[in-house]
Amino acid sequence: MRLTIRVIALTLLVAPVFAADHPDFRLWKADELRTRDAALSRKVGPDHSSRETLADFGDHRFRFLHRNADGFPEQHDNIVDVVFVQSGEGTLQLGGVMVDKKATGGAGEFVGSRLEGGTRHPLGAGDVIHIPATVPHAFLVEKGKHITYVLVKFPEQ
């Protein structure tokens, strides 16, 4: 009987060690994202956006962005964007021709002054978007509104 109690006690002590999450596991609960959303809305810069990196895993990263006006169009030749809209609303302008296209710091990274043509997709909380590499895109936000989203960036395979 004493041996059984000792085995059970030892099992209860050791079990949590084996049940621990992987060191790269991340979970952002809805309440935490709402708190971060509110904080970002108070830190909007001259470009009408604020952002933070939620996690960087080397080959991919999670960003959290808040915009209260149109963003500049961008294009990533080697990076795929996946977007999870957290709050607000806006429009994704996808494709078309990037006007005043300029290379930025990274290889295959470009920004422009606007997009001509392409398609427009209304966005709202809960929407999920996959933006392929090489496709120019911009997030548009009506005056007095905002859009906040989780952005996952990873290399095109």
Label every PLM stretch briefly.
Residues 6-16:
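Bacterial N-terminal signal peptides
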Residues 17-77:
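A short, N-terminal "cap"/entry segment at the start of jelly-roll beta-barrel domains
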Residues 74, 81-84, 120-121, 128-129:
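His/acidic/aromatic-lined binding-pocket segments of jelly-roll/cupin-type domains
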Residues 77-97, 104-114:
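Short, conserved beta-strand element in jelly-roll/cupin
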Residues 109-129:
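Acidic, glycine-rich flexible loop segments
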Residues 122-142:
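Conserved metal-binding segment of the jelly-roll/cupin
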